[in-house]
């Protein structure tokens, strides 16, 4: 690796290239690979966080597709502070996207730029320090790279090997590829003006423009996530070190009894000489469990989602509420592991209907019967429950969420 020396002061800006669509990484429905989750967060969040927390970062520009701004903002929410990050919109090729990012970064006045693939999340600050040291020593272009270790073959159009390529002196290029900003901007502008669009990385443009490119040691971990299996393996790697994110939510509800023909508990109608008074069907058990589920992801309570002042919920079956809460949990990345309901009532007797209630909970929540529990007790004729003026319910939900981050 070449060593160069200079005392030129510098400031480093970052261009993260994230405008690609990632056709090789799965179906379009799965979204661009830079926004797929690994270890509970989008790929780009891991990449961005490394630069945000690197002490030498002066400014960051992320180049994205115009359709992805909402995805990026969502990813940024998982990072402690990325408020100073700017967005540029990319073109139809990586080369066009890099040019857009470097043009925007130039306005900030930084002297040097690191250009990095968003889908290389496993670099570290040591790598950035090595690149920065080479820039500080006066190198106009710096390329982190790893010596090629695999045997290389050249083949003809019929897939027949024509030769074994000597690997001595061959390196696999990585990012961030880093430059004096004015030099690489001029090189990109000239390439665009000359309609030269066949470059596979920024170092190749620098070479074409006559800039000497200095190699520094890359990192074996600094792999590019290209295909679907890469993303799955990255997720396995990061998830292995995460604590399980197990959350417990509690809910409580009570409804008054009045003369009637029966009560609905856990979605099961039980004939009785009283009924529960409420805006909906007054299923006190499902109301308590709805609150318990919402509590596991900080999503408020049943009144926030279904206000009793709204006439559309008058007489509504409470399965609407519990299924809505279960969807919210799943949208937040949660898996419902257990639902437990304790009913407190003098009458009617719950025991004969317990299994039907458990079956309803299993149906509403989409979980197995063994994960659903219904219990009942009296209040020993004490208080409003003991006087048969109402029924109370206490519910607990256990949910496991992806990620394990506090």
From Swiss-Prot:
Catalytic activities: 2-C-methyl-D-erythritol 4-phosphate + CTP + H(+) = 4-CDP-2-C-methyl-D-erythritol + diphosphate; 4-CDP-2-C-methyl-D-erythritol 2-phosphate = 2-C-methyl-D-erythritol 2,4-cyclic diphosphate + CMP
Domain of life: Bacteria
Keywords carried by this UniProt record: Isoprene biosynthesis, Lyase, Metal-binding, Multifunctional enzyme, Nucleotidyltransferase, Transferase
UniProt GO MF annotations: 2-C-methyl-D-erythritol 2,4-cyclodiphosphate synthase activity; 2-C-methyl-D-erythritol 4-phosphate cytidylyltransferase activity; metal ion binding
Site (Positions MEP for the nucleophilic attack): 167, 224
Chain spans, region 2-C-methyl-D-erythritol 4-phosphate cytidylyltransferase: 1-246
Function recorded in the entry: Bifunctional enzyme that catalyzes the formation of 4-diphosphocytidyl-2-C-methyl-D-erythritol from CTP and 2-C-methyl-D-erythritol 4-phosphate (MEP) (IspD), and catalyzes the conversion of 4-diphosphocytidyl-2-C-methyl-D-erythritol 2-phosphate (CDP-ME2P) to 2-C-methyl-D-erythritol 2,4-cyclodiphosphate (ME-CPP) with a corresponding release of cytidine 5-monophosphate (CMP) (IspF).
Binding-site list for 4-CDP-2-C-methyl-D-erythritol 2-phosphate: 253-255, 279-280, 301-303, 377-380, 384, 387
UniProt site (Transition state stabilizer): 24, 33, 279, 378
Pathway connected to this protein: Isoprenoid biosynthesis; isopentenyl diphosphate biosynthesis via DXP pathway; isopentenyl diphosphate from 1-deoxy-D-xylulose 5-phosphate: step 2/6; Isoprenoid biosynthesis; isopentenyl diphosphate biosynthesis via DXP pathway; isopentenyl diphosphate from 1-deoxy-D-xylulose 5-phosphate: step 4/6
Classification via SUPFAM superfamilies: IpsF-like (SSF69765), Nucleotide-diphospho-sugar transferases (SSF53448)
Cofactor: a divalent metal cation
E.C. code: 2.7.7.60, 4.6.1.12
Gene source species: Rhizobium rhizogenes (strain K84 / ATCC BAA-868) (Agrobacterium radiobacter)
Protein name: Bifunctional enzyme IspD/IspF
Residue numbers binding a divalent metal cation: 253, 255, 287
InterPro entries in the record: IspD, IspD/F, IspD/TarI, ISPD_synthase_CS, MECDP_synthase, MECDP_synthase_CS, MECDP_synthase_sf, Nucleotide-diphossugar_trans
GO biological process terms on file: isopentenyl diphosphate biosynthetic process, methylerythritol 4-phosphate pathway; terpenoid biosynthetic process
The family this protein is said to belong to: In the N-terminal section; belongs to the IspD/TarI cytidylyltransferase family. IspD subfamily.
Region (2-C-methyl-D-erythritol 2,4-cyclodiphosphate synthase): 247-406
Transmembrane segments annotated in the record for this chain: none
Coiled coil: none
